[in-house]
Structures are given as C-alpha cells and as structure tokens.
C-alpha cells in the first residue's frame, strides 16, 4: 500500500444522507499526490477528491474507489500584502485564509456561508457567495493553479498564459486533475465592518423585485424566504444588503484583527454555540419550523429599512453560528435542492417551486435566494438570474413524496434552461464537465450519468 494511503474508511456527505466506503489517501505535497494517483491507477480504481467534507451530497464520495483528502495540503505558500494576492495549498480553509489577510487590509474575494471549506474544494466547485452578481464566483479571482493530471504530470497554470486551461479546471469537480495549489486575487477592505441594510418583503415577487432593484448598488445581497405560507404570503422574506466602508469612514481601520471577528461563543449570552443545535431539535418538524419561520418574519419587520454595522465574519458565516447544525436533522439527514434559473423565468419558476411543495406536502425548512451573473467557465452553472436554495428534511414516511418533488424540480429546471450546483446536490441530475478524465469519478458522477441516460 502507498505510504500516503490510510486504508478503507467510511466517508459521509455533510447532509448525512449519503455515505461510501473508499480507500483514502492523505498526501502532504505535490509529490505525494503524484504517488497517490499512481497507486490508484495500478489498483485499477477511480478517485474522487475531498476537502473539508462539506458537500451536502455525494460529490466527494466514491463507493468502492479511492478518495484523496487535501487536509495535509494546508500551507500558505506566499502572501503579497502590498499587491493583494495569495498562494495556498488546496487544503487551506477559508478561515485560515481570511485570518491571514484581514490584518493586512484584505478579504477573500468570494466566501460561502461557512469558513470551514477548503480553497481547493472551493475552486473545484467554483463556489459563489453573496456577491456573485457583482464579483462572480471564486474562479473569477483565480490567477494560477497547480494541477496533477491522471498521468502524474504536474502543470502550473497561469491565467496570463493558459486562461482556457485554468477555466476548464475551475468548477470541474476535480474530474480533470487534482488541484494542489491555488493563487487568488484578494479584495481590498478598509474596515473589519460592513454597513448592512435590512429589508422586509411581503411576498416572493416583492422579494425578487427588491433584490433585483437594490443588488446593483450593493457589494453583497442575500434573501431568506418563508416557504410555509400559501397565497400572497408565499416567499415573504428578509433581505440584507451590505457595503464595504470607504477609507474615510469613522469605522475605517477598526475590527481588522482576528480577535475582532470572532463569532459569539453563545446564543443570547446563555446557550453555548456548540450546543445550540440541541435546542433546535424540538422544532425540527413541520409545525415547529412553521413557527420558527414566522418568528423570523415578525422579528425582522421592525428592522425594515434600518442599517447597522456588522463584522465581515458575522455577516458571511451564518452557518458557523451553530456548529454542526445539520445534526438537528438526525437521524436521517437533509438534502438541499438549489435551482439556478434565468432572470426572466425566476418569478414563475420559484413560484412553481413553492406551489409544488404544497402539492406534495414536503416543505422546505430553509429557503435562500441570491442574485447571479453569468460566467464563461467550461462547467458553468450560473445564469444571469437567481438561485433558490431549499433545505428538506429526510423522513422515512415521506421519501416517495420528496423524490417526486425533486423530479418535478428537475423538470422545472429543464423547462426554463436552469442548472444545478454540484456542491449542494444529492438528488438532482446535472451536467458533467466535457473533458472529464476517466480516472476521476464520484458517486455524484455516476448518479448524474445514470440520470442523463434515463432522460435520453
């Protein structure tokens, strides 16, 4: 066995629905990645890639095959604090990155809702954040990559010389090579605070209208929606728009140290964050979540139109407020279906998505809407439009209804020319990269391939 292999292990998707048993490799250098791939080839296996294991479904699982974990590739290689760029190994997390650059007046150009994801995983999935509509996905800010191909060759790619090759790797799920290093342009910031505007809306149409109207003048924008009401109240929401502070702002230069950005250690000063998921468990049912969503609507109304200061970490990393919050969905887990649809179809498509929940009796406990702009990556999922992310509990008595709902969403996306996002998917049928190398595979790849054959 290869010295970087640790034997067979059972790995799970973050949503706790998918799992697989695989031969696991933990390389710590480019050379050990080359060694791991050689061992995989000689064993006649396929291989998937896994960073922090935060893909909701089966994108980082490979039943009966191999998985390369990037946890040992965790070094910051180079930081240019004057020019604003950083080179890191693939296993460096967003948390490690922002803590390294914020004291120098920089911030990662794109971050998801958790700081625990790895940069290699972020690039492989081409993650987006609350600023996709203005800054694009993370791939827009990648200036260089180191990639080990299936034959063991190491390629160092730069956008100045190999733009097409870089953009083919970004978002390809690691299906055309193993990413070992990433170079990123950083975002200049003058304060550790953002100026955040809160907005309340009475309906889905109003939510989308306000998001479209206010996003262009904002640096970040996101909307939470209530999926439980029927009629005109369906899709009512709370929106947040955030802006960077200028260098002459009274808060410029403040909260630039890591300690200033720490999330609170407790909820309301009473319940430790690490135990907060336990307090939510009694509400993890339809009546409880209807009440939770209503409470959020009511509590948000007095803040309508008000602005306040919030640290970057507090604004961006909502999923880290309650560590391990997915455990509220034990023992069966959750799935997320995220619909990306063109702008002109969004109002009708999202309205239909909520209607289908009422028809099937399967309600989303969390709905999040974002504005997007298109990109030109080979594995693009982002339109000039909107996305709607929907979290569903997995219940044994409702599995058939949940499957029907997800198949209806597949049909809906196909009808409007929409797309799926691999990092979140556990149930849909999406498009695979055209230049996929057969050495690289995953449970998601095989599921999508089977779904495409069924549709053909």
Language-model-derived ranges and their functions:
Residues 57-77, 129-152, 178-185:
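Structural signature of FAD isoalloxazine-binding scaffolds in flavoprotein oxidoreductases
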Residues 401, 412-456:
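Activity-critical C-terminal alpha-helical subdomain
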Residues 124, 143-348, 355-356, 363, ...:
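C-terminal substrate-binding/cap subdomain adjacent to the FAD-binding core in PCMH-type
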Residues 346, 357-360, 394-405, 409-421:
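Extended C-terminal subregions enriched in glycine
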Residues 18-113, 125-131, 223, 369, ...:
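Glycine-rich N-terminal segment of FAD-binding domains in flavoprotein oxidoreductases
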Residues 335-339, 385-394, 429:
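Short, hydrophobic beta-strand segments
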Residues 32-35, 96, 205-207, 345-351, ...:
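Short, conserved charged micro-motifs
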């Amino acid at each position: 066995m290869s010295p970087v292999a640790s034997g067979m292990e059972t790995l799970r998707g973050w949503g706790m629905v998918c799992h697989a048993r695989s031969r696991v490799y933990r390389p710590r250098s480019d050379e050990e990645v080359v060694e791991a791939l050689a061992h995989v080839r000689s064993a006649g296996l396929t291989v998937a890639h896994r960073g922090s294991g935060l893909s909701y479904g089966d994108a980082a699982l490979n039943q009966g095959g191999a998985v390369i974990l990037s946890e040992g590739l965790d070094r910051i290689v180079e930081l240019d604090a004057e020019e604003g760029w950083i080179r890191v190994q693939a296993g460096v997390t967003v948390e490690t990155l922002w803590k390294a650059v914020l004291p120098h007046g920089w911030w990662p150009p794109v971050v998801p809702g958790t700081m625990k994801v790895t940069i290699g995983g972020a690039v492989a999935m081409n993650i987006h954040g609350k600023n996709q509509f203005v800054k694009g996905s993370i791939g827009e800010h990648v200036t260089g990559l180191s990639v080990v191909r299936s034959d063991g060759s190491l390629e160092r790619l730069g956008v100045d010389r190999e733009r097409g090759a870089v953009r083919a790797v970004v978002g390809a799920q690691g299906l055309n090579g193993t990413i070992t290093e990433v170079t990123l342009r950083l975002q200049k910031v003058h304060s550790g605070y953002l100026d955040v505007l809160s907005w309340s809306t009475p309906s889905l149409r109003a939510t989308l209208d306000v998001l479209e109207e206010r996003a262009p003048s904002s640096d970040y924008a996101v909307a939470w929606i209530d999926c439980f009401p029927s009629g005109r109240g369906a899709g009512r929401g709370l929106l947040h728009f955030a802006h960077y502070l200028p260098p002459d702002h009274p808060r410029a230069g403040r909260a630039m140290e890591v300690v200033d950005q720490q999330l609170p250690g407790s909820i309301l000063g009473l319940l430790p964050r690490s135990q907060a998921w336990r307090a939510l468990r009694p509400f993890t049912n339809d009546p409880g979540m209807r009440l939770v969503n209503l409470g959020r609507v009511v509590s948000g109304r007095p803040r309508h139109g008000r602005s306040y200061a919030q640290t970057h970490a507090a604004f961006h990393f909502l999923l880290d407020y309650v560590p391990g919050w997915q455990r509220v969905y034990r023992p069966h887990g959750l799935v997320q279906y995220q619909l990306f649809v063109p702008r002109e179809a969004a109002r009708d498509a999202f309205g239909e998505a909520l209607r289908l929940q009422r028809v099937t009796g399967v309600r989303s406990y969390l709905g999040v809407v974002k504005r997007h702009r298109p990109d030109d990556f080979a594995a693009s999922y982002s339109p000039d439009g909107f996305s709607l992310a929907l979290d569903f509990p997995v219940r044994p008595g409702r599995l058939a209804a949940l499957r029907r709902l997800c198949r209806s969403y597949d049909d809906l996306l196909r009808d409007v020319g929409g797309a799926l996002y691999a990092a979140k998917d556990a149930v849909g049928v999406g498009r695979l990269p055209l230049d996929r190398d057969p050495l690289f595979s995953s449970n998601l790849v095989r599921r999508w391939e089977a779904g495409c054959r069924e549709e053909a």
